[in-house]
């Protein structure tokens, strides 16, 4: 993450305040300590996790859902990916729930099976529908106030585009909602419309495209999903 930030110091849409401090001014952050222990990256970078329960941990975890053969390993690595910065229990839970939903979706689990597992394992209420949330939802950058709503947008969708439209129109932290919803929807529907894919990859820095190509080659992602963009064939 530090390498990406150094190459792209101001991400499209910007980075969160605490994350910017973690990246560029790590000494200003208080090292948050809990039962998980220290991040494995602290000793070499001088950066410490800062106890965040923010939805950034869930927003960035999607790739973890594609790398591993078992749900247990997926959840374990999702926790590690979150704890580098977001080592609050809610931050870790949000990342694990998102990665678990993606793993289940790519392995052909039904929406109801995904709903039941996430509710039972992570305690999120997924029975409130998109129609319930749309008129009442507002800004919330916590995992506990974002991940359930994002999963709900997926559960109530008919295809990938519909899932994204629901997430964006819900309001609040809509880019994060769409990241979480879209990661699950792509794994489930296994296709992204060409028009959407072209607009997404167009502004990417070259390093992002190199990483995407590597992920396609090294995981089942490349043979499972149809990315409807000319660059991907």
Where does each model-flagged region fall?
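Structured, active/binding-site neighborhoods that engage oxygen-rich ligands
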Residues: 1-233
């Amino acid at each position: 993450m530090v390498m990406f930030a150094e190459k792209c110091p101001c991400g499209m849409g910007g980075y969160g305040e605490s994350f910017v401090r973690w990246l560029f001014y790590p000494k200003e952050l208080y090292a948050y300590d809990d039962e998980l222990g220290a991040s494995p990256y602290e000793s070499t970078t001088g950066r410490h996790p800062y106890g965040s329960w923010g939805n950034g941990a869930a927003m960035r975890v999607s790739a973890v859902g594609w790398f591993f053969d078992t749900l247990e390993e997926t959840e374990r690595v999702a926790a590690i990916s979150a704890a580098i910065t977001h080592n609050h229990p809610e931050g870790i839970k949000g990342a694990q729930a998102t990665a678990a939903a993606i793993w289940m979706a790519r392995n052909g689990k039904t929406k109801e099976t995904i709903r039941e597992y996430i509710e039972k394992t992570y305690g999120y209420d997924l029975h409130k529908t998109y129609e319930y949330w749309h008129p009442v939802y507002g800004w919330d950058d916590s995992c506990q106030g974002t991940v359930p709503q994002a999963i709900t947008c997926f559960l109530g969708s008919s295809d990938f585009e519909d899932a994204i439209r629901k997430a964006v129109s819900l309001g609040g932290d809509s880019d994060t909602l769409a990241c979480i919803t879209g990661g699950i929807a792509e794994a489930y529907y296994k296709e992204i419309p060409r028009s959407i894919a072209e607009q997404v990859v167009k502004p990417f820095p070259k390093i992002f495209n190199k990483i995407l190509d590597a992920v396609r080659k090294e995981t089942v992602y490349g043979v499972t999903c149809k990315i409807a963009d000319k660059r991907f064939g």
